[in-house]
Amino acid sequence: MKNIRNFSIIAHIDHGKSTLADRFIQFCGGLELREMSAQVLDSMDIEKERGITIKAQTAALQYKARDGQVYNLNLIDTPGHVDFSYEVSRSLSACEGALLVVDASQGVEAQTVANCYTAIDLGVEVVPVLNKIDLPAADPERISQEIEDIIGIEAVEAVRASAKSGIGIEDILEEVVNKIPPPKGDPDGPLKALIVDSWFDNYVGVVMLVRVIDGSLKPKDKIKFMATGAEHLCEQVGVFTPKSVQRPSLNAGEVGFVIAGIKELKSAKVGDTITLVSKPATEALPGFKDVQSQVFAGLYPVESHDYEALRDALEKLQLNDASLKYEPEVSQALGFGFRCGFLGLLHLEIVQERLEREFDMDLITTAPTVNYEVVMKDGTVEVVSNPSRMPEAGKYDELREPIITSTILVPQDYVGSVMTLCNQKRGVQRNMQYMGRQVMLTYDLPMNEVVMDFFDKLKSTSRGYASLDYEFKEFQSADLVKLDVLVNGEKVDALSLIVHRASSVYRGRELVAKMRELIPRQMFDIAVQAAIGGHIIARETVKALRKNVLAKCYGGDITRKKKLLEKQKAGKKRMKQVGNVEIPQEAFLAILQVGDK
C-alpha cells in the first residue's frame, strides 16, 4: 500500500486540468500513441467542446520514480464547475492529495478557492502547480504570491509547468510521490468502499467508480449499499488505465470500477458506502447526502406528438445523471411537457443541449425558477417551484425565498460596479477582504435574482474578470408577488413570474413592452397586459394589420413559391396557438431578458 498515491486535480475552468491529465497518461504510458486523443478523460462531446469536465473519470498509472521504485498513481479527474460541487467533494474525499493547478497568467479564481477549501476541510494534502508557464503573459512570481494571499498555502516552491508543451510533467509526478501521503486503511478489516461516481453502460448496466478504504472486494462477493440497503452480486472489478482492465480483486487504498448488474443509477448513489453482506461494516463513510435540485424549468416539445420521445430521452439522460429530476406537467399554453430540476444554470444548459444534440429534440424551455416555501393560513408549509402553481394572494400567510451565500472574487478596479450590481439584486453584504490585487466579496443574495441573469451581468460589469461561487444558505421571508401576463384577456401560464413587490411594476411594464415587439400583428388588435392578482399594472396593444401583403409572387418558378411556403410552415411549427393569438418561442424567452432597473 505504501506505493499507492491517490490524487485529484483542482483547477478553474480552462486552467489546463484535462490537458495535464492527458500528459500524465502519456508520460506513464497509459495509452499507446495512436489511442491518444486530446482530453482523453472528457468522454462526452459536449465536455470537449465547452472545455469543461462534467463527470469524474479516473486513470491508474504506473510511474517509475527517480528513487527507482514503481508507484501506482490513481488520478481522479474532478469537475471544476460550481454546479457540480457535490461531485467534487466526493472525488476529493477519495484522495489523499490534490494538485492545485493555477493558470500562471490568470491567477486564482473563486471556484478554485471554493474547491481548495473543500479539500483542506477534508484533510487532503494540497500541492500547488503553476500551469501555462510558457505563455508570454505568465507571471509566476505574482501568482504564487496570490495563492499564498488568498488560499494561504506555501507556494514559493510550486512546480512550474506547461501541460501543452510538456514542461515539468516529471517534476509534478515527483511532487505527487513525495508530498502526498500513501493511503491509510485496514486491508483485512470489513469492506468499506466509497462510490465516487457512477454511470450507465449499455452492455453491463451501472458501472461504479469506487475507492476502497478498508478490506478488499472481488467478483462473486455479495455487496450491500449502506444508504439504500440494496444488495447485489459483484460481477467484475478492475481499473481504468484509462481503458478498462479487469483485475482479480480491488484492495484497500485502490481506486477502480465495480460492475454488479445494477439496472438503474438510483441504486448506486454517489457518496454511498459499499460493504460485504457476509462481513458488513458497522458504520458508513461520512459525507453522503442526496443532491437537491436548485433550479427548475419547464421543457416542452414543439410538436405535441414528441412527448413520448422526450420522456424516453429524459429517462436515458437520467441513467447517466442522477441529479436530474423530472415530472410531467401540463401547461394550457404549451401542452404536455416536463418540469425538470437541475443543480444550477450550467447543468440546465448542458441537459438542454444534450437533449437537442443527442436525441434531436425541438424544445421550448420556460424561464428558470427556484423553490419557494409557502406558509398557508393553517400553518402548513408547501414547496412551490412553478409560478403558475402559486396559490392565490389571500390564501397564504407568508412566502419564503431561498437565499444563497455567494463569494465573488474581483479585481480592485471593478469592485464598485460589482457591489452596485449586488445591491440592485437585493443582496446583503456580509464581508469584504482585500487580497493582493483581488477583492473577495461575500454577499447573501436571493437565488431568484441569481437565476435570471446575474452571472451574465457580473461578467459584463467586470469585463469577464469576476468569478462566482455560491452555496444555499436558508429560506427567508420576502415580499414577493406573482406577475401574470394576459394576452387578449387570457392568462398565459408559461409566462407567469414571481417577483419582488418593489420591482414588480417595472418588471411588468418591461415584459409587456417586450411581448408587444415579439407577438406578430394579426387582423385585429391584441391587448397584452401584466397583472398582479386582479389588478392590471401595465398594458400595451399590438395594432392590427391593414391588409395581407403576400401578393409579391406573381408568375415565377414553382420552387420559389414552395420555398416561401416551406419557410412559413417551419415558422408556424415553432409557434403555439394561445386562444386566437400565436405566441412565438422568442416570447417565452423574453422573460429572461427583462432586466432590473
From Swiss-Prot:
Family: Belongs to the TRAFAC class translation factor GTPase superfamily. Classic translation factor GTPase family. LepA subfamily.
Broad EC category: hydrolase
Record's protein name: Elongation factor 4
Primary gene name: lepA
Positions that bind GTP: D14, H15, G16, K17, S18, T19, N131, K132, I133, D134
Pfam families given in the database record: EFG_C, GTP_EFTU, GTP_EFTU_D2, LepA_C
Membrane topology, record value: Peripheral membrane protein
Biological process according to GO: positive regulation of translation
Cell location: Cell inner membrane
Organism: Chromobacterium violaceum (strain ATCC 12472 / DSM 30191 / JCM 1249 / CCUG 213 / NBRC 12614 / NCIMB 9131 / NCTC 9757 / MK)
HAMAP family recorded: LepA
